Amino acid sequence: MPKRILQGVVVSDKNEKTVVVRVERRFAHPLLQKTVRRSKKYKAHDENNQYKVGDTVSIEECAPISKDKTWTVVSAQSK
């Protein structure tokens, strides 16, 4: 099964070797047909503590690292 890759913005880097990434998705509301935005936060592994708040990053699904972390940061797009 292929690994999922998501893009989001780093919203917290206070934990050691961990960043919190907010991933936003958009979809059409089934009744109103209006575009709705929903977001979800993922904890991702950052081995070198190199990503800071505001960075746009790609995260990839991986084997569980801890109770909450099952994603790793792959690369950064921009600030």
From Swiss-Prot:
Gene Ontology CC terms, in alphabetical order: cytosolic small ribosomal subunit
One GO MF term attached to the UniProt entry: structural constituent of ribosome
Top-rank taxon, per record: Bacteria
Alphabetized Pfam families for the sequence: Ribosomal_S17
Alphabetized CDD domains for the sequence: Ribosomal_uS17
General function of this protein: One of the primary rRNA binding proteins, it binds specifically to the 5'-end of 16S ribosomal RNA.
Family of this protein: Belongs to the universal ribosomal protein uS17 family.
Assembly description: Part of the 30S ribosomal subunit.
Name by which UniProt lists this protein: Small ribosomal subunit protein uS17
Species: Rhizobium rhizogenes (strain K84 / ATCC BAA-868) (Agrobacterium radiobacter)
Gene: rpsQ
